[in-house]
């Protein structure tokens, strides 16, 4: 049996998560299905993402950090403990690009101390995320500087950054992006087109919120 931890570089997996408080998450979705169901969807997807991440943590391929919005530090600590995640940080203010850059800076010392080479960012909007998605990302970061998982809405569901990028914060591809637009992925690619960075795409995935809506309407969620 292959011991992946011996042949692959360890990564820090940062999960960008939002507290699933009533009326405080998935605001656009809340208008369609109600605040209670919207909060329930957020909770289900967060728990699924955490469970998937832990499957790689258990084989020592990743350390997990959860970057939280929607709560103060004290409640973030409490929630991360409930989720079984030891390491957490507040996302802070700004656009998504600014928040991700902040997480890189905050975690830089931790990465050096723990000999972590790469940083991978994921959100909690992908119900069909599986451990193979993350394992493939870690494998591809051996040969590439940047990994992107395109989504059906013109953005991406994952971004993986190699040591070459994060060590000096050079050419961070998600800076100066107009988020929530259809060309987020293309703008990200354009940001490093002039560099010699190597990149690769993962398979395109659907942001399957609608599937969860149907399950709720059919009373299939616990």
Regions found by a protein language model. Give the residues of each.
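N-terminal nucleotide-binding beta1-loop-alpha1 segment
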Residues: 1-29
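A short, N-terminal amphipathic alpha-helix
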Residues: 40-59
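Short beta-strand/loop segment that forms part of the nucleotide-sugar
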Residues: 62-71
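Short phosphate-binding loop-to-helix
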Residues: 77-117, 178
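Short aromatic-hydrophobic micro-motifs that form the base-stacking/packing surface
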Residues: 118-122
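Conserved donor-nucleotide/metal-binding helix-loop-beta segment in metal-dependent transferases, i.e.
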Residues: 127-155
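Short, glycine-/small-residue-rich phosphate/pyrophosphate-handling segment
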Residues: 166-191
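Conserved alpha/beta core of the MobA/IspD/sugar-nucleotide pyrophosphorylase nucleotidyltransferase superfamily
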Residues: 183-222
């Amino acid at each position: 049996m292959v011991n992946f931890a011996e042949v692959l570089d360890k990564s820090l997996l940062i999960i960008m998560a939002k507290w699933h408080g009533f009326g405080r998450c998935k605001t656009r979705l809340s208008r369609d299905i109600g605040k209670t169901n919207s909060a329930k969807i957020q909770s289900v997807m967060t728990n699924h993402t955490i469970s998937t991440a832990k499957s790689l943590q258990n084989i020592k391929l990743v350390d997990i950090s959860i970057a939280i919005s929607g709560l103060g530090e004290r409640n973030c600590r409490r929630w991360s403990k409930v989720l079984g995640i030891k390491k957490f940080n507040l996302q802070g203010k700004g656009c998504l690009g600014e928040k991700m850059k902040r997480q890189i800076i905050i975690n830089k010392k931790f990465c050096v101390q723990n000999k972590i080479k790469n940083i991978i960012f994921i959100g909690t909007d992908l119900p069909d995320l599986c451990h193979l998605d993350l394992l493939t990302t870690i494998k591809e970061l051996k040969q590439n500087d940047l990994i992107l998982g395109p989504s059906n809405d013109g953005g991406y569901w994952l971004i993986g950054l190699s040591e070459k990028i994060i060590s000096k914060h050079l050419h961070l591809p998600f800076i100066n992006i107009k988020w929530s637009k259809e060309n987020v992925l293309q703008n990200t690619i354009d940001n490093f087109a002039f560099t010699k960075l190597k990149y690769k795409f993962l398979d395109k995935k659907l942001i399957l919120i609608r599937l969860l809506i149907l399950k709720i309407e059919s009373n299939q969620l616990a």
